[in-house]
Amino acid sequence: MSESIRLSDHFSYSKLLRFTLPSICMMVFTSIYGVVDGLFVSNFVGKTPFAAVNLVMPFVMILGGMGFMIGTGGTALVSKLLGEGKKDEAHSTFSMMVLFTLLLGLALSAVGVLTMPAVARLLRATDTMMPDCVLYGRIVTGFTFTFMLQNVFQSFFIAAEKPRLGLFVTVAAGVTNMVLDALFMAVFKWGVAGAAIATGLSQCVGGVLPLIYFLRPNSSLLRLHPTALRLRPILQACGNGSSELMSNISSSLVGMLYNFQLLRLIGEDGVSAYGVLMYVQFIFVAIFIGYSIGCAPVVSFHYGAGNQNELKSLLRKSVLLMGLGGVALTAAAMLLASPLAKLFVGYDADLYALTTHAFRLFSWSFLLAGFNIFASGFFTALNNGAVSAIISFLRTLVFQAGSVIILPLLLDVDGIWYAITSAEIFAFIISCTFLLAKRNKYHYM
């Protein structure tokens, strides 16, 4: 069982999969309950509110992405300290990251609530979409601080050698969201406000339960205790995790660009179709992200301990697993395109046909996505936030934005659906280049 596996162990394929499985399940389940949110809005509220939620979602994810940055960057730092045998410093740094997350999250919650009408206008919400954009956005961003805490603790549960407990918390949050979605939208008919409240309350479960656990005496590697904020560790953690923030911001900005292009070329149906693709992509890519999150503390620990042979083994095994996973998920996406589109938008024949066609073109991106996500996470785990951020920035912003702008000129609307695959191909080249260039510094080859 994964609770018996220690960061200091030698990891076979079996042990690596057992250790990372809870974080994979955690990320997949997080994505699934996000998808359920979309399903309820689309089927019980309508396609215009569904488009409104999808339009404002990138801004919400940018705010929440700060939690991913602190969580992944802080976990890399804390795991390295544990590998070096500096347990007291690891506890202090962990406590500092949680306090910083809480304070920053409260500030961002206020910003989100106050600026939402201006944000909706900036995102070019139509007159029919504007009320739902503002209502949903204000409620959800009001819970940004709990969303950030949830994201931070997802990473730290793994460093604390409690991945299964992290999975339990995620499942509890997800079940809360799904039950409240059904209650607020299907029974009480609260519309997008119900979806937003359900999401916010589920994030309270995901953010507050771990806080209580780590504040109390526990059997994990980490403890929370009173601490002061120190600039250097915070900047170091933010630097390490900058690729995760960059990925979040870039994906959100590119999502806005997709929406602009689709509104121009197709209209609201294009935004709705793209929303379906994003919800399903969350689930598929969550497998790769979950593996990278689960593997990262192991890489950081052995890097801190100077175990070069284990680093080589972890990289070799991970590359093979990402390759096999890419093939499997691409095949699954092709086969499931039609039924998944029907699940979301089967009530509208034209929208269903558009979504199915788009999904089949979009699916090729999964072939290389896992490798690129792991490469970025691998450098974060090695405490090289700069390289990780470059890979992430190029992959999620530069290459995708360029493709979304250029490919429609050559392939019309199909160019939009092929854009992400084009970006993954270029990112694969960059990832391979950095892995080869840095091999002598870190001795992982």
What is each stretch, according to the model?
Residues M1-T20, V78-F145, V187-S242, V299-S365, ...:
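Short alpha-helical transmembrane segments in multi-pass integral membrane proteins
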Residues S8-V45, P58-G73, L77, L81, ...:
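N-terminal transmembrane alpha-helices
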Residues R18-D37, I139, Q150, A173, ...:
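Transmembrane helical elements of multi-pass membrane transporters/channels
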Residues L21, C25, V56-F59, L99-L103, ...:
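Hydrophobic residues within alpha-helical transmembrane segments
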Residues I32-F50, A120-D127, L183-W190, S252-I283, ...:
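Helix-terminus/linker motif at the lipid-water interface of multi-pass membrane proteins
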Residues F50-A110, F147-G166, A273-A337, A369-I391:
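Small-residue-rich hydrophobic transmembrane alpha-helices
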Residues I62-G65, N177-A182, G207-L211, F282-A286, ...:
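Hydrophobic transmembrane alpha-helices of multi-pass small-molecule transporters
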Residues G71, I139-I158, V169-N177, A195-V208, ...:
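Short runs within selected transmembrane alpha-helices of multi-pass transporters and secretion channels
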